[in-house]
Design a protein with these regions (language model features):
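Nucleotide-activated chemistry modules centered on ATP-dependent adenylation/adenylyltransferase
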Residues: 1-32, 42-341, 345-356, 360-539
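Conserved G/P- and acidic residue-centered "switch" motifs that form tight phosphate/ATP-binding loops
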Residues: 38
């Protein structure tokens, strides 16, 4: 590193610290630092704590409360959550030792809002770019809940974020759009009475690493280890910080991003793959499980053909110039071409499709489903196509994962955890309880979660009968036989039994009757409603 660069970074750091001091001392509005464990949030957190320690030496009065929060989604990359936990503990010890008004904590989603409750419990499709349900529920909501509690106590708050200009064009546009001219703070996008301060906004990536590697972490963290994590996540292609401009175009060393190990928003998890290639081989089963989830997302055999609320919708099918219909390959789903052969529509696998044509095509398709007692909660595709008056063709849209697929997901997850060559816990027992509660609502009365768990673990874990209704296999067979004899939907009957059990002992039947009515509406009445054509509106 040149002397000139040394002077440049020193001047930048000095200017940044002076700005932090001025803003900190000007009022008593509490600060909330968002810490993710990455380089930028680590830099922002460290430079603020370094500045507070300087103010302490300067005998300045430190009366403003500084909160540091980190969102643990409970599916974070293992090495990152370990770093976060050590950092939070280290910061709290430092604050206590130096009498700093700093308090660090980890926030988490409620168990029923977590990844496994939504994916395996409710059957949400794996997150992708168009249906990214995970971020709000698992990361933003817990942080917002904490922020709201601080605002409720103090009236307002300032969020400190490690965002920088030059990270991306979209990030730069966001920063520009929320900047208030002549002010130190930016507008918060969603929360009233809160503002955003970005102390390292003018830092480059090299500035961040220069600061971290030139200044020892005040709470005892290892910034060299952090840099190694970034290097490992990129297959061990470690590179020096100060590179030529040509070198910088060829590598992204030190510019990686960490996320959830189970993330399916990207097609390939380069970070997890990089860790494995760098020698952390016990992560391989996690990558295998993640890749399997990615592969089955659009597998029609593993998805319901209705929404969780019982309604159905139709998705447009692409039509070729010769009139053939084509369902594109996606994930494990093979490409399927449907041809009109002398009035019969037959696909690439020799299967016939039922086609309903005209302005009443949707209504006729719904009637067909009801009359033939087709269970849309199963994976089997009823092979229904409608041709509307616009001359376009549509097929049934996909809904949540089927209950059987969710059982398969849990089985593979617990098998992965049981065979993992590391004590890291992939799913908490509290999450298993939530999954069983949700499965009960889907008609699972066998306590399947506990049964699956016992295949891999011989401990005292059990799900209380207070949380679920448990029937023996003999009970279920008898109930099923009765339903067959009376020509009644066995699955619906089990779900109605669940409702009765939930409201047992209530002095009034009003709520029970409302729940029963809603369930019947889900199963039959919603089928009569007009469907939508957005394939990601599963719920």
């Amino acid at each position: 590193m040149s002397i000139l660069n040394d002077l440049d970074i020193s001047k930048l750091v000095e200017t940044t610290k002076n700005k932090i001091k001025r803003i900190y001392l000007q009022d008593n509005i509490p600060w909330i630092i968002g810490y993710s464990g990455g380089k930028d949030s680590t830099c922002a957190t460290q430079i603020i704590i370094d500045t507070l320690l300087e103010l302490k030496k300067e005998k300045s009065k430190l009366s403003k409360k500084v909160y540091i929060i980190s969102s643990d989604t409970m599916v974070e990359t293992p090495m990152i959550i370990n770093t976060i936990e050590r950092t939070i503990n280290g910061i709290n010890s430092l604050a206590k030792k130096n009498n700093l008004p700093v308090e660090a904590s980890i926030v988490r989603p409620d168990y029923d809002r977590g990844f496994w409750a939504n994916l395996i419990g409710r059957g949400y499709p794996c997150p992708n770019q168009t249906f990214r349900w995970c971020t709000d529920r698992m990361k933003i909501e817990p942080a917002n809940k904490f922020t709201e509690s601080v605002i409720g106590e103090y009236g307002e708050a300032v969020m400190i974020l490690g965002v920088r200009e030059g990270e991306s064009n979209s990030r730069d546009r966001v920063l520009e759009n929320h900047t208030i001219e002549g002010k130190d703070f930016m507008r918060h996008t969603t929360q009233a009475n809160s503002y955003v301060f970005a102390p390292i906004r003018q830092f480059t990536k090299d500035d961040v690493w220069n600061y971290l590697l030139s200044n020892k972490s005040p709470w005892g963290g290892d910034n060299e280890e952090l840099f190694k994590l970034y290097s490992d996540s990129l297959s061990g292609e470690e590179c020096p910080i100060m590179m030529s401009e040509e070198d910088k175009k060829k590598t992204t060393c030190g510019n990686s991003r960490f996320g959830c190990w189970v993330c399916t928003v990207v097609s390939e998890d380069k970070s997890l793959t990089g860790f494995i290639r760098s020698g952390i081989t016990w992560l391989k089963p996690l990558l295998d499980y993640r890749n399997w989830l990615y592969s089955i997302r659009d597998d029609e055999d593993k998805r319901m053909k209705r929404r969780a609320n019982g309604s159905i919708y139709f998705c447009k099918i692409n039509k070729l110039e010769n009139g053939d219909l084509v369902i594109s390959a996606k994930g494990n789903r093979s490409k399927n071409i449907i041809k009109n052969l002398n009035g019969e529509w037959v696909d690439s696998f020799g299967t016939k499709w039922n086609v309903f044509v005209g302005d009443k095509s949707e209504e006729e398709a719904r009637d067909y489903i009801v009359k033939n007692n087709i269970d849309l909660t199963l994976g089997e595709n009823p092979k229904i196509i409608i041709k509307k008056v616009d001359e376009e063709f549509y097929q049934l849209g996909l809904g949540p994962f089927t209950l059987e697929t969710r059982k398969e997901m849990l089985t593979k997850l617990l098998m992965t955890q049981a065979n993992l060559e590391h004590p890291h816990q992939l799913i908490k027992q509290e999450e298993l309880v939530e999954i069983q509660k949700l499965w009960k609502e889907s008609g699972d009365l066998e306590n399947s979660v506990e049964k699956i768990y016992k295949k891999f673990y011989n401990d005292d874990f059990s799900i209380s009968s207070d949380d679920i209704t448990v029937f023996s296999n003999d009970d279920l067979k008898i109930l099923n036989d009765i339903c067959v004899e009376k020509d009644f939907d066995a699955k619906l009957f089990m779900e109605l039994l669940n409702i009765e059990r939930d409201f047992a002992g209530y002095s009034s039947r009003v709520e029970a009757q409302r729940a029963i009515k809603n369930k019947l509406s889900q199963e039959y009445l919603a089928l009569r409603e007009k469907g939508e054509t957005n394939e990601d509106k599963y719920y």
